[in-house]
C-alpha cells in the first residue's frame, strides 16, 4: 500500500483523542458566523480539522470528519441530511490527513509556511470554491456564478487567515509530548 495513505493504528488513546476532537469541532462549529446563509460561513473549526488530520492520518481523518458532519447534521434539527455534504467533509478530512499527518511545523521554517499555504489553498479550493458551490447549485438552485457574485469570492481572504492561525497555533500544540506521540512525528 502506498505510504501516502498510511494511517496510524487506532489505539484506545488515539480513538479517545479523535472522539474528543470531534466533540471540540462540534462545539466550535457552533461559533460559526453565517455571512450569506447556506452559502458563506466563516468557521474556526479548521484548526481542529488540522489536529484531526495530524493525529488520525488520512483514513481516520476521513472517517472522523464524516462522523462529525453526520452528528452535526442530526443534532441541528433541520432535517436536510445530504450524503454529498458528508462526503465533501470526509474528503477534506482525507486531505487534512495527507498534508498534516507526521508533519512537524515550525514558525521559522519557510518550507513549513509553504507547506501550510499549499495545503490550505488545496483544501479550500476543493471545499469552498468548487464542490460547495456545486452542491449549493444542485440542492438549492443557486447558480454557481451567482454565489460568487453574492460574495463567495470573499472566502479567498480566509486563506491567509487560516495560514497564519495554523502556523501560530500548531507548532505550539506540537510541543506537547503526548500530541507528538499521537502524531507519529519522525
Curated annotation (Swiss-Prot):
This entry carries the following GO cellular component terms, namely: plasma membrane
Cite the GO molecular-function annotations of the record: folic acid binding
| Bilayer-crossing regions | 16-36, 47-67, 81-101, 116-136, 153-173
**Topology within the bilayer:** Multi-pass membrane protein
Keywords tagged on the record? Cell membrane, Folate-binding, Membrane, Transmembrane, Transmembrane helix, Transport
Q: Where in the cell is it found?
A: Cell membrane
Assembly, per entry: Forms a stable energy-coupling factor (ECF) transporter complex composed of a membrane-embedded substrate-binding protein (S component), two ATP-binding proteins (A components) and a transmembrane protein (T component).
Question: NCBIfam families under this entry?
Answer: ECF_S_folT_fam
Biological role: Folate-binding protein that interacts with the energy-coupling factor (ECF) ABC-transporter complex. Unlike classic ABC transporters this ECF transporter provides the energy necessary to transport a number of different substrates. The substrates themselves are bound by transmembrane, not extracytoplasmic soluble proteins.
User: What is the name of the protein in this document?
Assistant: Folate transporter FolT
The gene is folT
Amino acid at each position: 500500500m502506498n505510504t501516502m495513505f498510511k494511517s496510524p493504528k487506532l489505539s484506545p488513546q488515539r480513538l479517545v483523542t479523535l472522539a474528543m476532537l470531534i466533540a471540540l469541532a462540534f462545539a466550535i462549529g457552533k461559533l460559526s458566523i453565517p455571512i450569506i446563509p447556506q452559502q458563506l460561513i466563516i468557521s474556526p473549526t479548521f484548526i481542529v480539522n488540522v489536529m484531526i488530520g495530524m493525529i488520525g492520518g488520512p483514513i481516520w481523518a476521513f472517517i472522523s470528519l464524516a462522523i462529525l458532519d453526520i452528528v452535526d447534521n442530526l443534532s441541528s434539527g433541520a432535517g436536510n441530511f445530504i450524503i454529498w455534504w458528508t462526503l465533501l467533509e470526509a474528503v477534506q478530512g482525507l486531505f487534512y490527513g495527507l498534508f498534516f499527518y507526521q508533519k512537524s511545523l515550525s514558525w521559522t521554517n519557510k518550507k513549513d509556511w509553504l507547506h501550510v499555504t499549499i495545503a490550505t489553498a488545496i483544501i479550500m479550493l476543493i471545499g469552498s470554491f468548487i464542490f460547495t458551490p456545486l452542491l449549493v447549485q444542485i440542492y438549492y438552485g443557486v447558480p454557481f456564478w451567482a454565489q460568487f457574485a453574492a460574495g463567495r469570492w470573499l472566502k479567498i481572504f480566509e486563506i491567509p487567515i487560516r495560514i497564519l492561525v495554523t502556523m501560530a497555533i500548531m507548532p505550539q500544540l506540537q510541543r506537547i509530548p503526548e500530541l507528538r506521540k499521537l502524531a507519529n512525528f519522525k
